[in-house]
């Protein structure tokens, strides 16, 4: 903890500097600089507050120990002992919380995301389940105060989704949804099953951070643009003109389709933004093999036996196989109440990080 304490002392000094800068008229007048400073302050605020509470508790314990050592007032001594017992528990909890807050940050945690959901093994039932997952994430996003827009989708005749790509924007979206990557398995009786037998199907979910203002120039000659009619989930955005846009970056084979905006021009602009992000990610991965491996690791193959989570409808049960978490709340989870699952995953992976840091210390 000594090394962490030294870092915290430096962090507190920097935090105080930032607070002074935020009151500086010159900084306030520079909008870009001011936004950078306020973001840095917000990122540091919680850990600095906990560190200050930690130090205050330590000082209070030291004061109580003096009362105990003096021993002249038995009643005060007893009160000091009780206070110190409570403060020691609080300090222990603060230490754990501070360690987690000081873990290396995932640079993508603050980013918005593109989420791709695909029906995998199981035919029509897999496509219906893909639609259920789409609605689950839309409701969860709504609960978080995030915004969701459909980037591209392909529906099936039974009302499910062969694939759906959505953009979710808001506060720390990637940090919450990055653990949703993988194959999701459903066990239930399909509506088409007359014998009432439980079937197993899967859908895959891929979560990719959306890079902002990517510094990459794409040669227009290397991009094929196709336009077609929107065919989304229905509603007022669907029109009879060829407003949907599909862009293919020929050197990498990366394809982006966009149909959620109201005009072809808007779809072109958004598709180009996403394409730049994907191509940037590709080149950051250095080559096609690494890029493909990253995406495969994210979603798996969609095979029934390869799953991160199982949704068992007859038993109203959801099991996350990575952490051994089972909740008999499937109805609530499918209605977007994912916090309990996501919080458990976050704690699990943070604990693993702490263990790895301890081993390498």
Curated annotation (Swiss-Prot):
Entry GO MF terms: translation release factor activity, codon specific
Pfam family, one: PCRF
Top-level taxon of origin: Bacteria
N5-methylglutamine found at: 236
Entry comment on modification after translation: Methylated by PrmC. Methylation increases the termination efficiency of RF1.
Protein location: Cytoplasm
Entry keyword annotation includes Protein biosynthesis: yes
Protein's UniProt keywords contain Transit peptide: no
Broad class of the protein's primary localization: cytoplasm
Keywords: Cytoplasm, Methylation, Protein biosynthesis
SUPFAM superfamilies, per the entry: Release factor
GO cellular component, one term: cytoplasm
Function: Peptide chain release factor 1 directs the termination of translation in response to the peptide chain termination codons UAG and UAA.
Family per similarity comment: Belongs to the prokaryotic/mitochondrial release factor family.
The protein's name in its UniProt record: Peptide chain release factor 1
Gene source species: Lactobacillus delbrueckii subsp. bulgaricus (strain ATCC 11842 / DSM 20081 / BCRC 10696 / JCM 1002 / NBRC 13953 / NCIMB 11778 / NCTC 12712 / WDCM 00102 / Lb 14)
Lineage: Bacteria, Bacillati, Bacillota, Bacilli, Lactobacillales
Gene behind the chain: prfA
